[in-house]
A protein has these predicted regions:
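Short, well-structured N-terminal submotif of metal-dependent ribonuclease cores
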Residues: 1-41, 50-68, 143-148
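Short secondary-structure boundary/capping segments
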Residues: 2, 26-28, 68-69, 77, ...
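Acidic, PIN/NYN-like endoribonuclease modules and their adjacent C-terminal/linker elements
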Residues: 3, 109-111, 115-149
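Generic structural signal for small/hydrophobic residues in well-ordered secondary structure
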Residues: 7-8, 45, 66, 88, ...
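Alpha-helix capping/helix-boundary segments
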Residues: 10, 41, 84, 110, ...
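Residues that scaffold the ATP/ADP-binding catalytic core of kinase and kinase-like folds
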Residues: 13-14, 26, 48, 87-91, ...
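Active-site neighborhoods of divalent-metal-dependent phosphate/nucleic-acid chemistry enzymes
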Residues: 47-52, 71, 75-120
Length: 149
């Protein structure tokens, strides 16, 4: 695999004041150039900021975190290409056919991004993308030794 596409829940957890030990250990062990974000995760993070009322004490802190993420991952923030959009359509349609439920757009877009870039999708929401065909790694539960780069 070519690296790790980090889901928003992973980004939020490692950016917090006290990330869980297992997650922090895994994250720190990864080569920086193997860690990637999707522009969709940045949008989700921004959405979370916008949920906070204007003047909320945490707004500024989260805005600063988002800026640090954009700077840290510069050159490793993946956009949504035509190939990713088409892959998402295939995944979304197949998952709905199999499960009779519409999957989360963002989660399946991240799965499509990981597939198109040959990456693992690092997420806590493994069940949400179980039928996507993506190689999914849950850093809270899975053994990293089973997911070689």
């Amino acid at each position: 695999m070519n690296g790790w596409l980090l889901d928003t829940n992973v980004i939020s957890a490692v950016s917090g004041p006290k990330p869980e030990a297992r997650l922090a250990t895994w994250f720190k062990a990864q080569p920086e150039d193997a860690l990637f974000l999707s522009v969709l995760s940045l949008a989700e993070y921004w959405k979370g900021i916008e949920h906070l009322p204007p003047g909320h004490s945490m707004r500024s802190k989260h805005q600063q975190t988002l800026l640090r993420l954009e700077n840290r991952f510069q050159g490793r923030i993946l956009s949504v290409s035509n190939a990713i959009a088409l892959r998402w359509g295939m995944i979304s349609g197949e998952v709905k056919r199999i499960t009779h439920h519409s999957p989360s757009v963002i989660d399946t877009m991240l799965a499509a991004t990981a597939i198109e870039h040959g990456m693992y999708l690092a997420t806590r929401n493994a069940t949400d993308v179980a039928h996507s065909g993506a190689a999914v790694f849950n850093p809270w539960k899975d053994d990293p030794a089973n997911f070689p780069l």
